[in-house]
């Protein structure tokens, strides 16, 4: 079980309350696919991912980025039990999709950069500390079935 301070809970809720899920989700997934091109192998059914421009303009990638970000709502609503909240999703990614669990961290890194850029100057050190704790528990929960 994760222990959260009132301040950490407030920080995470504040971040999510101000997110444009479509914009942040799209930008984060696009950034991940462009910066870490080997992650594209999981998106073979999403059409042309030939270069950065085609990735940025791909509506399937945009929609999936939004879906991923909305998936974080589950962790937000279940902050005290993130591990069990994502147990089924972890199983799907490990057993059926065979996603390299390190890709969760790569996407989380990209999401952090996009959120920080959007929130400037509100993405303070304290905000980042709370966010890093949240995202680290999500990444760990998603990779749980790989252990």
UniProtKB/Swiss-Prot annotation:
GO BP terms in the entry: hydrogen peroxide catabolic process
InterPro entries linked to this entry: Globin, Globin-like_sf, Globin/Proto, Hemoglobin_b, Hemoglobin_oxygen_transport
Domain Globin: 3-147
Pfam families: Globin
GO CC terms: blood microparticle; haptoglobin-hemoglobin complex; hemoglobin complex
Record: residues binding heme b: 64, 93
Reported tissue expression: Red blood cells.
Molecular function (Gene Ontology), one example: metal ion binding
Keywords, sorted A to Z: Heme, Iron, Metal-binding, Oxygen transport, Transport
Quaternary data: Heterotetramer of two alpha chains and two beta chains.
Chain's role: Involved in oxygen transport from gills to the various peripheral tissues.
Similarity comment text for this entry: Belongs to the globin family.
The name this protein goes by in its record: Hemoglobin subunit beta
């Amino acid at each position: 079980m994760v222990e959260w301070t009132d301040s950490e809970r407030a920080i995470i809720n504040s971040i999510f309350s101000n997110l444009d899920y479509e914009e942040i989700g799209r930008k984060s997934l696009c950034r991940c696919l462009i910066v870490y091109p080997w992650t594209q192998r999981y998106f073979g059914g999403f059409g042309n991912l030939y270069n950065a421009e085609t990735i940025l303009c791909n509506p399937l990638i945009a929609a999936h980025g939004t879906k991923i970000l909305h998936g974080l709502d589950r962790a937000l609503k279940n902050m005290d039990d993130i591990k069990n909240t994502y147990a089924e999703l972890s199983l799907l990614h490990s057993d059926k999709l065979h996603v390299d669990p390190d890709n969760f961290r790569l996407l989380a890194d990209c999401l952090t950069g996009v959120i920080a850029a959007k929130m400037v100057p509100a993405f303070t050190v304290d905000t980042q500390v709370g966010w890093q704790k949240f995202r680290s528990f999500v990444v760990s929960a998603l990779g749980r079935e790989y252990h």
